[in-house]
Design a protein with these regions (language model features):
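HTH-adjacent hinge/linker in prokaryotic transcriptional regulators
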Residues: 1-15, 21-26, 30, 36, ...
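Conserved phosphate- and dinucleotide-binding cores of soluble alpha/beta proteins
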Residues: 36-166
């Protein structure tokens, strides 16, 4: 398991991250998130200390965006940072639809000991306008088994560890 008891982790916004949040409720953790749904859900569990980054609420994702949250993210040193994306690609890296979201996601990962992309294989080969980071800047990529073999082989030559989730 990537997440261990006592870890300080950052969770990006989105439906994939909510699924991850559901898998870690049994662990004592410190969780920092931009996602309002994740913050409210995890706050129900006494062994999990939840911090929401603050800032303006993005109505499309019900998450915090803007400089306020970015400043907090720039001053923390989490064990793990889980980032999601609109698209990911060997050549283009991880991408986001807006400059503001791309910047926030960069800060979310910047100081983490492990930088983990959590992305559905259906988003592979798709990309948005703004680059977040190259895949080589990650320590781990977690995706599902529907990734084509050729893509999987290409990803296994990179420095991030490729993890196929059940």
């Amino acid at each position: 398991a990537l997440v261990k008891a006592g870890d300080a982790i950052v969770l990006d916004a989105g439906t994939t991250m909510i699924e991850l949040a559901r898998q870690i409720t049994h662990l004592p953790l410190r969780v920092i998130t931009s996602d309002l749904h994740i913050a409210l859900f995890l706050s129900e569990f006494k062994q999990i200390e939840v911090t929401i980054i603050g800032g303006r609420i993005d109505d499309s994702s019900q998450s915090c965006i803007g400089d306020h949250g970015r400043r907090l993210l720039q001053t923390i040193w989490p064990d793990l940072a889980f980032v999601s994306c609109n698209g990911w690609d060997l050549e283009k890296g991880i991408t986001a639809p807006t400059e503001e979201k791309a910047a926030l996601k960069r800060d979310l990962m910047a100081n983490a000991r492990r930088r983990i992309l959590l992305a559905d294989s259906s988003k592979y080969g798709a990309w948005s306008l703004f680059n977040i980071a190259p895949l080589a800047s990650l320590t781990d990529i977690v995706t599902d088994a529907h990734l084509p073999d050729k893509t999987r082989e290409a990803l296994e030559t990179l420095s991030p560890q490729l993890i196929i989730a059940d």
